[in-house]
Amino acid sequence: MAAGTLRGLAVAGGGESSDSEDDGWDIGYLDRSSQKLKRSLPVEEKNETFKKALTTGDISLVKELLDSGINVDSSFRYGWTPLMYAASVANAELVRFLLDRGANASFDKDKLTILISACSARGSEEQVLKCVELLLSRNADPNTACRRLMTPIMYAARDGHTQVVALLVAHGAEVNAQDENGYTALTWAARQGHKNVILKLLELGANKMLQTKDGRTPSEIAKRNKHLEIFNFLSLTLNPLEGKLQQLTKEETICKLLATDSDKEKDHIFSPYTAFGDLEIFLHGLGLEHMTDSLKEKDITLRHLLTMKKDELTKNGIASKDQQKILAALKELEVEEINFGKLPEVTKLEISGDEFLNFLLKLNKQCGHLITAVQNIITELPVNSHKIVLEWASPRNFTSVCEELVSNVEDLNEEVCRLKELIQKMQNERENDPTHIPLVEEVSTWKTRILKRSAVTVCGFGLLLFIGKLTLQRK
């Protein structure tokens, strides 16, 4: 394996790399059979072998080297300790072993802590969680920030580790801390589109109104990064989840947030956090968690729920107070409701031309809004199906609705053409009617034309007289 590649792997996820080109991690092939340790080996060779053992995760060789006298907190050329490297690659077994041998869990290099290295490690959430749990058990500070003022919870939220976020808060992490750009853990989760992390942070008391240094809230950050579902969810003013778990003790919080899982390894008590669907997130945001099971039993999707009227909600057994919350939320989510209720009643015989023209103008304006809305959706919709944010229904359902839309648009086109023909027919009949009296505008136009001609004639005569006088004076 190339040394350059492995050097890249040795850099912690927090992005705090060494300025030195030679970081001391020149990893080559390690043959245990040819690397039998002898206590008489020079210190330099022992250190080199130690680095290779850490890289390969060879715990037995690491143990043998430590037994031979190498310091567990040895600082290599770039300043990392063995524990920091093990945490940065989420090697929980190696982290446990080094801690048991007395490694310092609170060590930092240029404000990059071992806990931050673990929270930003490239590994499964299960392995990251194990490492974080071990470090916290050895009194690692969850609020120590790196040079960019990012705390461990921000790294965990950025990488979508819901359980890690919960565990850090349970151990005293400040949920609303801000980095050098004003980002909180919630802002980072919104930026990356981690909806489960967002839901958990709101339960833990995250303030969704805190702004970045350029004045953006988490919802605006989500919209900017095209996470529209998260933008809509965070835009809701109702948020009964906020601070829901803040009053619990540390032990109660851990038990509440992290359930046991008998299928997992015995040395790791935490089970993966259950993923929330769109319906669950919407209901949780309104404090209507109790409705989840009943709606699922009736096969009511979020898309269906969002289109229901009050009578439909009642038919489906939704209580009046719950209906009010849903309808209020839907009102906030509406971008622009097309309301034809205020259009004039054109069926009345007494309707004036102005009212009818006003009706046509409003109808045309509403059609323009519809065209713009569809164009915006086409622009924003991802080309790849796996990037679609609103997973409310299958693409087949979307296609079916689009087919109905096309049919309705064709019907509308036919009706508008009929209306145009009818108006044209009325206009022709009116012009051919001998009893037709010219409109006021027509009469005024005729009079105006005569006045203009008279004015031109008078000016012409005046000009001729003026020229005649000049000619006489010259003579």
Swiss-Prot record:
CDD domains: SAM_ASZ1 (cd09521). Residues 272-334 form the SAM domain. Disruption phenotype: Mice are viable but show profound defect in male meiosis leading to male sterility. Testes display increased hypomethylation of retrotransposons and their subsequent expression as well as piRNAs suppression. One of its GO terms (biological process) is germ cell development. Expressed exclusively in testis and ovary with higher levels in testis. Gene3D superfamilies: Ankyrin repeat-containing domain, Transcription Factor, Ets-1. It comes from the Eukaryota. ANK repeats lie at residues 45-74, 78-107, 110-144, 148-177, 181-210, 214-243. The modification Phosphoserine is found at residues 17-18, 20. Plays a central role during spermatogenesis by repressing transposable elements and preventing their mobilization, which is essential for the germline integrity. Acts via the piRNA metabolic process, which mediates the repression of transposable elements during meiosis by forming complexes composed of piRNAs and Piwi proteins and governs the methylation and subsequent repression of transposons. Its association with pi-bodies suggests a participation in the primary piRNAs metabolic process. Interacts with DDX4, PIWIL1, RANBP9 and TDRD1. This is Ankyrin repeat, SAM and basic leucine zipper domain-containing protein 1. It comes from Mus musculus. The gene is Asz1.
